[in-house]
Design a protein with these regions (language model features):
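Hydrophobic transmembrane alpha-helices of multi-pass, membrane-embedded glycosylation machinery
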Residues: 181-198, 217, 352, 356-357
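Intrinsically disordered, polar/acidic, low-complexity terminal segments
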Residues: 6-62, 67, 71-110, 151, ...
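Membrane-embedded glycan-lipid processing machinery
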Residues: 28, 80-84, 122-133, 333-337
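Hydrophobic/aromatic-rich transmembrane helices and adjacent perimembrane loops
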Residues: 126, 133-137, 329-354
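Membrane-interface alpha helices of multi-pass inner-membrane proteins
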Residues: 160-188
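Transmembrane alpha-helix segments characteristic
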Residues: 13-14, 110-117, 213-217, 298-325
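Transmembrane-helix signature of polytopic, membrane-embedded enzymes
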Residues: 100-120, 138-139
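Specific aromatic-rich, kink-prone transmembrane helix
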Residues: 133-156, 165, 188, 344-347
Length: 447
């Protein structure tokens, strides 16, 4: 009964916590990436013309429907987007809780794992509502990994088998966006494990791999038509950078692991070598978890923890490979990547606690609880710091609202600095459009 209540109630309480945080730390105003979105899609929110291009899949098509709902019923509220993100994060926590309940993990451990999902190390994604769809994508990733688990049960699961044939298309073509590469790679590697370790039917696995690779291929083709804006990135080649700064990539990669313990901002003025040592410690935990997973997956008949830790590790690699161009060793510690890294941390902890149940040794128990304590303490500090910062962030959002409302009288420099977008002309264009349609900061309730 306790496990069931934990799996169902804690995600609800977590959602309420995020709701309270968002209301205390943000205000309803377009800024940063919203400027681009307004200019691209809000001239006629019902129009399909922005999607009738080769790069359609990079625009994450589900946003078309969500944007219509937001404009029609909420007057293009960024707060609505933020609440959607919080809701899907809570749904992720619910799926994790159900897995812990099924595996009969201790109630206290299950509760702490669920609470880790609601760490405010993701504050940057939570407060930028345009990222709501990424939280939704991770719900679908979890559904895929849990469907693999259902498939591995002795009786099998025909519904799960059918689901795994259509779920990748829904996920990749409509929700995943740039996250689909790691999802696709994780799904394919999982099928390889299923064939080699579980001796399952190769033909069925091949069909599921094709079901992943076909939509991913379409996304890859679509992405080739897109043009990305990367302000602040170097134009040097990676070879030139490695020659001039040989430690940049290793430090970038290692320190990204430190951010799963403590957020960069909450760490304050800690010297960089502390981040490096912390990152190496987390990497060591990853190595132990992968080693234990090799022995564990057959006994548990479960791919879920392995998929989580595998995708988390691959996300660290992807962020390093795609963001080194900003030439900052701590760039990978940004809160905007916390959602991608978080799955690895959860998979690691699940493997450790499932190992405790299997082996029952003191060493396994100490390792599991030690790792849990490390992640919990770090994330408590990060969350406490972010709660402390909430009123200051609120002040910043209120200032953005005032500048946005009075954009006509503001200088270009003020608009660029306050609304965190590089092009003052595009900012003015977006705000004129919102003003003409009485949306967002220009919406006034009728008495």
């Amino acid at each position: 009964m306790g496990r069931k209540m934990t799996a169902r109630l804690l995600p609800l309480f977590g959602f309420l916590f995020l709701t309270a945080y968002l209301r205390s730390a943000t205000a309803d105003v377009v800024y940063t990436d919203y400027i681009r979105l307004v200019n691209s899609y809000l001239e006629n929110v019902y129009s399909l013309s922005p999607y009738l291009h080769g790069d359609v899949l990079t625009r994450i098509p589900v946003n078309y429907l969500e944007r219509i709902v937001n404009v029609r019923f909420f007057h293009y509220s960024t707060m609505f987007d933020m609440m959607l993100g919080a809701f899907f994060l809570a749904l992720n926590a619910y799926l994790l809780g159900r897995y812990c309940e099924k595996k009969r993990l201790p109630v206290g451990v299950s509760a702490l794992l669920i609470l880790l999902v609601f760490s405010l190390n993701k504050w940057e994604m939570l407060t930028n509502g345009s990222g709501w769809v990424h939280f939704a994508a991770f719900v679908l990733f979890f559904c895929h990994y849990l469907s693999l688990d259902a498939l591995l049960q002795k009786t099998g699961d025909r519904k799960a088998a059918r689901r795994l044939l259509w779920l990748p298309s829904l996920t990749i073509l409509f929700f995943a966006g740039p996250y689909c590469a790691i999802y696709a790679l994780t799904a394919v590697l999982a099928e390889l494990v299923i064939v080699l370790r579980f001796r399952r039917d190769f033909r069925q696995s091949a069909l599921r791999v094709i079901a992943v690779l076909l939509p991913f291929g379409l996304y890859f083709i679509s992405r080739s038509f897109s043009v990305e804006e990367r302000h602040g990135a170097t134009s040097e080649s990676i070879f030139a950078v490695v020659r001039s700064r040989p430690l940049l990539l290793p430090r970038f990669f290692v320190r990204s692991f430190a951010s799963t313990v403590i957020g960069q901002e909450s760490a304050g003025s800690l010297p960089d070598f502390v981040f490096t040592l912390l990152g190496l410690s987390v990497l060591a935990l990853y190595a132990i978890a992968f080693w234990r997973a090799a022995k564990l997956i057959e006994k548990e008949r479960s791919m879920f923890p392995l998929c989580l830790i595998g995708s988390g590790f691959l996300n660290h690699m992807m962020v390093t490979a795609s963001r080194w161009i900003f030439l900052r060793e701590n760039y990978g510690m940004s809160s905007r990547y916390a959602l991608q890294y978080q799955v690895g941390m959860l998979g690691l902890l699940l493997i450790f606690f499932l190992s405790v149940r299997e082996s029952g040794t003191k060493r396994a128990r100490r390792l599991a609880y030690g790792a849990l304590l490390l992640f919990c303490l770090g994330n408590v500090l990060t969350t406490a710091h972010e709660i402390h910062m909430a009123p200051y962030r609120k002040e910043n959002f209120v200032a953005m609202r005032e500048v946005a409302r009075n954009y006509a009288a503001e200088s270009d420099e003020t608009l660029v600095k306050t609304l965190s977008y590089h092009d003052a002309a595009r900012i003015r264009k977006a705000l004129r459009l919102l003003e003409s349609k009485q949306l967002n900061v220009f919406y006034e309730k009728k008495e």
